[in-house]
């Protein structure tokens, strides 16, 4: 069945009526006319790729230079021992007890066992917070915190933060994880005049690090960010709040169950407030 003459389709370039313009037949177009936008897009993409590659090369080169000029960390263990001798009797026992180590890692640096000395995601958050003026959002790994305690305790500013990042990477390349935790536990300040895990365990709870219970270990791990403000002897409620936070992080990371966290928080903290020395059990 054919079309009526007025409605039958007409070839390209032929109008239905004299006042109507039809598009040209695509086959009659100059190939260069439709190819130009595509070529422009490719040129833009190539330029973007070149810029990104240049930035990547520059970043790698900058990283290498910074790593080269950052001081060696071979004396880190000696520095930790010096802090021990200056503030308390060094903890002579085995590696950092599991309860405290797990509590510290869960709340301060949950990627500790998988990261290369620096948490790039956290660093990005800190950089964004600094640029936007929203203050410190956290982000220092245990390596960087240890680097600060050993090498730049009074430093500040972006230059010091970069140095701490590079020192943290060097610490990771030089020492095993267990040694990093041990040095951290030996030099960290826990408030109330207690430097080191041994002094804090003895001073607050009258026990050694190996004798810490779950709520005690969680409390001490929660002190490292605000040792004076969260001192459980002077600010008991704040310390319990930090304990609850650490227990929650242990639940989130799968180290304990919610029931265990609830039972631990229900226990009363047996605070002693001693000198921080003389504990043997």
Where are these regions (language model features)?
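Juxtamembrane regions of bacterial inner-membrane/periplasmic proteins
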Residues: 2-281
């Amino acid at each position: 069945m054919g079309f009526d003459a007025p409605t039958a389709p007409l070839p390209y370039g032929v109008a239905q009526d004299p006042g109507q313009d039809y598009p040209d037949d695509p086959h009659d177009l100059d190939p260069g006319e439709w190819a130009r936008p595509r070529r422009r897009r490719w040129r833009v993409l190539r330029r973007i790729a070149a810029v990104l590659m240049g930035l990547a090369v520059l970043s790698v080169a900058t990283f290498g230079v910074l790593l080269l000029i950052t001081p060696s960390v071979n004396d880190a263990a000696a520095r930790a021992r010096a802090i021990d001798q200056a503030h308390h009797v060094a903890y002579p026992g085995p590696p950092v007890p599991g309860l405290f180590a797990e509590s510290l890692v869960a709340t301060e640096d949950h990627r500790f066992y998988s990261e290369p000395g620096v948490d790039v995601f956290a660093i990005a958050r800190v950089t964004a917070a600094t640029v936007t003026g929203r203050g410190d959002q956290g982000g220092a790994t245990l390596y960087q915190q240890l680097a600060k305690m050993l090498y730049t305790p009074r430093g500040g500013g972006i230059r010091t933060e970069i140095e701490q990042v590079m020192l943290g990477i060097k610490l990771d390349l030089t020492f095993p994880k267990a040694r990093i935790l041990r040095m951290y536990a030996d030099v960290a300040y826990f408030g109330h005049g207690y430097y080191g895990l041994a002094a804090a365990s003895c001073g607050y709870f009258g026990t050694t690090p190996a004798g810490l219970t779950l709520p005690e270990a969680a409390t001490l791990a929660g002190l490292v960010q605000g040792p004076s403000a969260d001192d459980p002897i002077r600010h008991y409620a704040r310390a319990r709040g930090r304990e609850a936070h650490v227990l929650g992080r242990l639940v989130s990371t799968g180290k304990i169950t919610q029931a265990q966290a609830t039972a631990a928080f229900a226990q009363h903290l047996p605070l002693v407030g001693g000198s921080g020395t003389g504990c043997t059990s």
